[in-house]
Regions:
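Gram-positive cell-envelope targeting signals
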Residues: 1-40
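Cross-family detector of peptidyl-prolyl cis-trans isomerase
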Residues: 31-311
Length: 311
């Protein structure tokens, strides 16, 4: 009887230990996802000139607590290595837009050789099925047809922050970006939700069309965005300093070039159809065009990598 009791007790202890181990692993997994993940964006400016080439390392704090779907989407793309070797393709008055283009040869290609990335190939399989783990939009209300587009956690899409204190633009802030307009898909709708526990709802496609593009805010005057989601900010003083130094480097480069040629501009407008016509099977005609073109930096801003430093 004593031996039987010992066997039973041993089995019970083993079972309890196994349960404790499984619980610990589960808690560890959950603990890996923080409210404020961090990414590191590493870029170079004007790397064709070895005398002035410099690397800028920018650490970003992302706000998963406020924008869960947006943060999950960009973290997954970063983990896929999607952004490695991409460029800033549109340098606007208050932001630099990236995440959608590269060059055939990052060292020698000029502005005319800008080319789009194949987002569809990176996020769907050979059968056309979406391969992303984080899905926030679907073609149907039953959620049987996942899409590789991001649900718009924006006020224009009816999304609101619980306490009303979402992020707004300030120097260095990172936000979602898309060029599509209502005219490009006037009646198209999809189904989406802002987080796993919320109900799916029918929404306009043009507010839920983001794929991989993002912007870094460069303007001096900030403000809120209605169509785009500001989901992160520079994480520390060192990154703020480096971002400021990058802006200074661009300004100094432009001034130096203008001393040699007073007609010099930092960007060149590209309107070539192969560049500004963006393939989109959910748009009315299967694509949309950026009519005003892109203001492409003539001295490349290359994103050499985006890595997740903290989940």
């Amino acid at each position: 009887m004593a031996k039987a009791f010992q066997k039973t007790a041993s089995a019970l202890v083993c079972a309890l230990l196994c349960c404790a181990l499984l619980l610990g692993c589960a808690l560890l997994f959950v603990g890996c996802e923080s409210d404020y993940p961090e990414i590191r964006i590493t870029l170079t400016f004007n790397d064709n000139d070895e005398d002035t080439e410099d690397e800028y390392v920018l650490d970003y704090k992302l706000y998963r607590r406020i924008y869960p779907q947006t943060v999950a989407h960009y973290l997954e793309l970063a983990d896929l290595g999607f952004y490695d070797g991409t460029v800033v393709h549109d340098y606007r008055s208050d932001r630099m837009v990236a995440g959608g283009y590269t060059y055939e040869d990052l060292a020698s290609s000029d502005v005319s050789e800008l080319k789009p990335l194949d987002y569809a190939a990176a996020t769907t399989g050979a059968d056309g099925a979406v391969t992303l783990e984080n899905v926030s939009t679907w073609a149907d209300a039953e959620m049987t047809q996942p899409l590789n587009r991001l649900y718009g956690e924006t006020s224009a899409n009816g999304f609101s922050v619980a306490n009303g204190t979402g992020l707004s633009n300030k120097i260095g802030a990172i936000g979602t970006y898309s060029y599509i307009t209502k005219a490009d898909a006037p009646s198209r709708t999809v189904f989406g939700r802002s987080s796993g526990g919320s109900a799916v709802r029918e929404v306009n496609y043009y507010n839920n069309s983001v794929t991989s593009m993002f912007y870094l805010y460069t303007g001096s005057a900030g403000g809120s965005e209605s169509a785009f989601c500001v989901f992160g900010e520079l994480a520390n003083a060192a990154s703020q300093t480096r971002f400021s130094e990058l802006m200074t480097a661009i300004s100094d480069y432009t001034a130096a070039m203008q001393e040699e040629d007073d007609s010099f501009t930092f960007t060149e407008t590209v309107t070539d159809e192969s560049v500004v016509r963006i393939a989109d099977n959910l748009a009315s005609v299967g694509y949309y065009e950026v009519d005003e073109g892109f203001s492409v930096p003539v001295a490349k801003l290359i994103i050499t990598g985006v890595t997740v430093e903290k989940y």
